[in-house]
């Protein structure tokens, strides 16, 4: 399973660790992902999505039905 938020599309990005001496070593910044079940009132069922913390805030703001409609138009499975 890839580390990608289904709502926002956030994915890992590359960067550097910096020591006290400012030596650079490569690292990955991972999104804050959680598998979360959301109740969809229109369908009378739970839907499990892999979302970031920001994605949960988007769902709280827009509503799960609107977000699922966006996922359907993008052709994503959920």
From Swiss-Prot:
Keywords: Ribonucleoprotein, Ribosomal protein. GO terms for biological process: translation. One of its GO terms (molecular function) is structural constituent of ribosome. Coiled coil: none annotated. GO terms for cellular component: cytosolic large ribosomal subunit. HAMAP family: Ribosomal_bL28. Belongs to the bacterial ribosomal protein bL28 family. This is Large ribosomal subunit protein bL28. It comes from Pectobacterium atrosepticum (strain SCRI 1043 / ATCC BAA-672) (Erwinia carotovora subsp. atroseptica). The lineage of its organism: Bacteria, Pseudomonadati, Pseudomonadota, Gammaproteobacteria, Enterobacterales.
